[in-house]
A protein has these predicted regions:
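N-terminal pre-triad scaffold of radical SAM enzymes
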Residues: 2-29
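Residues at the C-termini of beta-strands that transition into short coil/loop
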Residues: 7, 131, 155
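P-loop/Walker A phosphate-binding loop and immediately adjacent motor/lid segment at beta-alpha junctions
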Residues: 78-90, 99, 137-172
Length: 172
């Protein structure tokens, strides 16, 4: 698996100050995608164990971070490898809230409870789901590009067996 970007601090990919990792590879090929170069699974750098530990040290060493966001590309095309990274993150840095982006919908990702995608979903807290649809582009939306995309509270959704929208801690 390759990563095509890492930002130790970002306010664009989820609520609060977050680290962001961009996973290479996507097969959705959404017209108007903001980063089509990330579709290539070989783009960027290998996500070696040494690089993973370096990023985990960054995250653990920054008390201002509210969590980690994983996007791409689409991380669910490398679900097993991304799950392994999240496991290592939690082992070495403790509980870190994880947001994840996907062109798949929550319903698609949660359909098969024995899949690698379902396992990855269960390791995360918030899912930004759905393909980017250029005709539904809305720059006023928080954390997503088109109005069909949703912010899903994964833990609540898995518990209730249906997609439950995420609620901001800053606007409750």
């Amino acid at each position: 698996m390759n990563i095509c970007g890492y930002s130790p601090e970002s306010i664009n990919e989820g609520e609060g100050l977050r680290a962001a990792i961009f996973i290479s590879g996507c097969k959705h090929y959404c017209p108007g995608c903001f980063s089509p170069k990330t579709w290539n699974f070989e783009y960027g750098e290998p996500f070696t164990l040494a690089r993973q530990r370096e990023i985990i040290r960054d995250i653990a060493g920054n008390p201002l971070l509210d969590g980690l966001t994983i996007l791409g590309g689409d991380p669910f095309f490398s679900a097993r490898e991304v799950s392994g990274f999240i496991d290592l993150l939690h082992l070495e840095a403790g509980p870190v809230p994880v947001w994840i982006y996907s062109g798949y919908t929550y319903e698609e990702l949660s359909a098969a409870s024995d899949s690698d995608e379902y396992a990855l979903l269960g390791r995360c807290d918030v899912l930004v789901d759905g393909r980017y649809v250029e005709a539904l582009r809305d720059p006023s939306l928080l954390y997503r590009g088109s109005s069909n995309q949703r912010l899903i509270d994964i833990k609540q959704s898995l518990e209730h067996g249906e997609a439950i929208l995420w609620q901001s801690v800053f606007t409750k």
